[in-house]
Each structure stands twice: as structure tokens, then as C-alpha cells.
Amino acid sequence: MGTSNQPHIVWHEASVSKEERQKRNRLKSCVVWFTGLSGSGKSTLANALDRKLFEEGIHSYVLDGDNIRHGLNAGLGFSEEDRKENIRRIGEVAKLFVDAGVVTSTAFISPFREDRDNVRGILDDGEFIEVYVRCPLETCEKRDPKGLYKKARSGDIPEFTGISSPYEEPVNPELIIDTDQLAVEEAVEKIYAYLHAQESGK
């Protein structure tokens, strides 16, 4: 149940519960929260997992950091305050997807541990699967698919995570994926197996 600081705004319960929606899916809805440096492989893994789930007939969706900034978060910049608001909004959107019975993958750098923990806090136990997409900065910088590291090194992008702004590594993530060691297919199978193990209570 949500809360509001406006006393005249009340929460309306849905006629179809989250549990009823989950029973129609083959996997319990949750947020698979991919976090890591730019270029670590978050979006690649999120979309590969989404494809795997789709092919298995499981309702799923990807919330991608770049895509969200084209719409919902178009007005936000990259200051610490705006980054926090970016993640707060995504957490709320992801929660709605979970309530709809959808396995939701999110691909955001989400550099601050507190922000990730806040998202975990608004979800039920077991619904936030933190996946640390771990990759050495040197490797991410070599990949640099968007040319962002080059711009950050030259000073064109201020407060760039890993260069001029910190990335706070997860302390106890549900999964760690080393993308400089695992192929995409191997990583997806590892995540997929984890989700099914959670479903069966193993």
C-alpha cells in the first residue's frame, strides 16, 4: 500500500491482486536490478534476460536508464540530487510493474547504495534482486560503446561515475556477474536459474 503526504489522497485497492496476476505468470514478479559502471553490460544483460523470459512465455519488461531519460525523467540532469530522484522514480515505476505481475529488469548505473536500498525497501521481501554487473573500470573504458569515458576524461562530462563521481559497490547483492569473464548467455542462464530457484524455494 502506498502513502501520501496529502491526507485527502487515499489508496484504492485493485480488484485484481498482485498474487492473482502472479499465478497467471510462470514466475513470481520481481525487480531484477542491474547495477554497475557505464559499459559494464547492464543493458545487454537486461535485454538478453528479457528475451529469454519472453521465449519462455513469462511476462517481463526492461526499464533502461537511457530510454527513461527520453521521457519520464527527461527533465533530470546528473547532479547527485537528480540522480537520486531518477532512481526514486524508477523504483516506484518498477514497483507498479511488479504489482502487475511482471518480471522487471532495470538497467541503471544507480551509483549510490542508499538509493538502491531505498528501492529494496518499498518492495516485498524477495522482490528486489540486486545484480551487480561487475567489470573493471579499465575494461569498461576500453569498451566505451557511447564514447562517454573519452568525454569524461576530457572534462566534457562532469560528475561521471567511475571517473569524477564515485560508484558505491553493492555490499550483499543477490548475484554478482563478472562480465569480463562470463559470456552473455552464461550470465543470463545464471540469473534465470536464480529466479527459478527462488520460485521453488530452493
UniProtKB/Swiss-Prot annotation:
Any GO molecular function: ATP binding
Binding of ATP, residues: G36, L37, S38, G39, S40, G41, K42, S43
Active-site residues, record numbering mapped to chain: S110 (phosphoserine intermediate)
Entry keywords, A to Z: ATP-binding, Kinase, Nucleotide-binding, Phosphoprotein, Transferase
Pathway annotation from the record: Sulfur metabolism; hydrogen sulfide biosynthesis; sulfite from sulfate: step 2/3
Keyword Secreted appears in the UniProt entry: no
Reactions listed under catalytic activity: adenosine 5'-phosphosulfate + ATP = 3'-phosphoadenylyl sulfate + ADP + H(+)
SUPFAM superfamilies: P-loop containing nucleoside triphosphate hydrolases (SSF52540)
EC number: 2.7.1.25
One family name in Pfam for this protein: APS_kinase
Gene3D superfamilies attached to this UniProt entry: P-loop containing nucleotide triphosphate hydrolases
Origin superkingdom: Bacteria
Family: Belongs to the APS kinase family.
Chain's role: Catalyzes the synthesis of activated sulfate.
Protein name (database record): Probable adenylyl-sulfate kinase
Organism whose genome encodes this protein: Halalkalibacterium halodurans (strain ATCC BAA-125 / DSM 18197 / FERM 7344 / JCM 9153 / C-125)
